[in-house]
Amino acid sequence: TATRGSRKEFPAVAVIVAESTQLTIYDGDDPDMPMWMVFDLLGTVGSNSNMLPRGGSGQESDITSIDFLNSKLVVGLNDVNGTVGEGLVEVNFISDFGRVYREAGSGYTSAIYNLPVSGRNSNSSYSGDYDSLAIITQTINDVAMTVLPNAPIDSATGLPVPTIAVA
């Protein structure tokens, strides 16, 4: 399809390209580097949106930063007009879910996308509001991940849980 390549398994070498309103993962295992998966930004957290939300009219968010480690893709979003962005989105490819991190009290803080990764561009919605997992601001300029020594092991993946730094 236009947003999903023919290979099922995640490539050992992935090239991830972020444009302002689209994120594309290319299969670096293949010398032709075909598209493996595309995420389109659409909609607003709190109403219908894709797994990567774009934001409402006049408050559109662009991708500012990405990182990938241990099956987790994190995407930072920042409002193009300087107001509050849509936050930080985590996509977990092994556990097959998306989660958005936002400010406490913003509604939908650490909410889970209602569809698996295969439904990432389906204009669904997020559910839940967990202020205990809030971030300081929804305006994301940069993101990085690392696995710290003695990091806990994710029981679903068997991989160490990365620490996510957000600026």
Where are these regions (language model features)?
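Non-catalytic protein-protein interaction scaffold segments in large eukaryotic complex-forming proteins
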Residues: 1-29
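Structural signature of eukaryotic scaffold interfaces centered on beta-propeller domains
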Residues: 1-11, 51-71, 128-161
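Structural motif
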Residues: 19-36, 80-95
